[in-house]
Swiss-Prot record:
It comes from Saccharomyces cerevisiae (strain ATCC 204508 / S288c). Interacts with H3K4me3 and to a lesser extent with H3K4me2. Component of the RPD3C(L) complex composed of at least ASH1, CTI6, DEP1, PHO23, RPD3, RXT2, RXT3, SAP30, SDS3, SIN3, UME1 and UME6. The record marks 282, 293, 297, 305 as: Histone H3K4me3 binding. Zn(2+) 1 binds at residues 283, 285, 307, 310. A zinc finger (PHD-type) spans 280-329. It holds the Pfam family ING. This is Transcriptional regulatory protein PHO23. Residues 255-269 have a biased composition (Low complexity). Component of the RPD3C(L) histone deacetylase complex (HDAC) responsible for the deacetylation of lysine residues on the N-terminal part of the core histones (H2A, H2B, H3 and H4). Histone deacetylation gives a tag for epigenetic repression and plays an important role in transcriptional regulation, cell cycle progression and developmental events. It is found in: Nucleus.
Length: 330
């Protein structure tokens, strides 16, 4: 059968340390009292001579001043060995107490590791009023943190939905703009072909009229008229067609230039939607989303989401909320 020392090594070591504490302390304290007994008469004498030296005026009697200082120095020399011995004993007692404290901590760790002390005895009962209050406070803190996290999730989902709607609207506007450009190009190409056909028809009719006239004239007159008609009709026809085409091209170029200038002005006035990393920008501060944010309930709000510090709020508002720009539109 195992002995109690082997069954509970930690508790037995704790008991030994607690029994050794008063013995070691009393031994060293006794030595300190013996040292103080040696100085029981010297300390009052030293204090008396120091007070007398401080109260006396030594403006003229310097010899008395030197004599008193010598007496004080002699008493200090008598007390010095006792004071040094007292410091030595104190340092030894401190080291011994430090060793016993380390031994006690190690024994307690062994007792906890071997479950020598029951949990109820070590931590106390669980039905204490203070423990109930602690559990209630912890439940309130957890419920509050859960409510904040749910609000943050709602705001995040709402922000993602509004961002998706905005991207869909931008895609729809871009496709509409491309369709308008293609229609304009098609109209421009059709009008250009019509002008070329009309110019060609005029040229052919003129050629047929000149040919009919030259058939009735003499050969020399035919040759002369053919040369005059060729030199007269060709440059005018070419210049007319060129002028018409240049006019149409200039008009389309000018319209495109005006549209590009308008787009550049609009892009200069409008706020950037994303930063250099492609992240969307929100709020009056034109920054990315962070922390808790509140969404504007306005139908056509440009900024959409706002940081709580930027609008002067500490918590999320209840019900509908509108930004300053949307309030002006209401």
């Amino acid at each position: 059968m195992s002995s109690p020392a082997n069954l509970f090594p930690g508790l037995n070591d704790i008991t030994d340390v607690l029994e050794e504490f008063p013995l070691a302390t009393s031994r060293y304290l006794t030595l300190l009292h013996e040292i103080d007994a040696k100085c029981v008469h010297s300390m009052p004498n030293l204090n008396e001579r120091i007070d007398k030296f401080l109260k006396k005026d030594f403006n003229k009697d310097h010899q008395t001043q030197v004599r008193l200082l010598n007496n004080i120095n002699k008493i200090y020399e008598e007390l010095m060995p006792s004071l040094e011995e007292k410091m030595h004993v104190s340092s030894i007692m401190l080291d011994n107490l430090d060793r016993l404290t380390s031994r006690l901590e190690l024994a307690y760790e062994v007792a906890i590791k071997n479950t020598e002390i029951p949990r109820g005895l070590r931590l106390g009962v669980d039905n204490h009023p203070a423990m109930h209050l602690h559990h209630e406070l912890m439940e309130k803190i957890e419920s509050k943190s859960n409510s904040k996290s749910s609000q943050a999730l709602k705001s995040e989902s709402r922000r993602e939905a509004m961002a998706a709607n905005r991207r869909q609207g931008e895609h729809y506007s871009a496709s509409t703009h491309q369709q308008d450009d293609s229609k304009n190009d098609a109209n421009y190409g059709g009008s250009r072909h019509e002008s070329q056909d009309h110019t060609g028809n005029n040229t052919n009719s003129r050629k047929r009229a000149n040919a009919a006239n030259t058939n009735n004239a003499d050969p020399e007159t035919k040759k002369r008229k053919r040369r005059v008609a060729t030199t007269a009709v060709s440059p005018s026809t070419i210049s007319t067609a060129t002028a018409v085409n240049n006019g149409r091209i200039g008009t389309s170029t000018a319209s495109r230039g005006v549209s590009s200038v308008g787009n550049s002005n609009n892009s200069r006035i409008s706020r950037p939607k994303t930063n250099d990393y492609g992240e969307p920008l929100y709020c009056y501060c034109n920054q990315v989303a962070y922390g808790e944010m509140v969404g504007c309930d306005g139908a056509d709000c440009e900024l959409e989401w706002f940081h709580l510090p930027c609008i002067g709020l500490e918590t999320l508002p209840k019900g509908k909320w509108y930004c300053d720009d949307c309030k002006k539109k209401l």
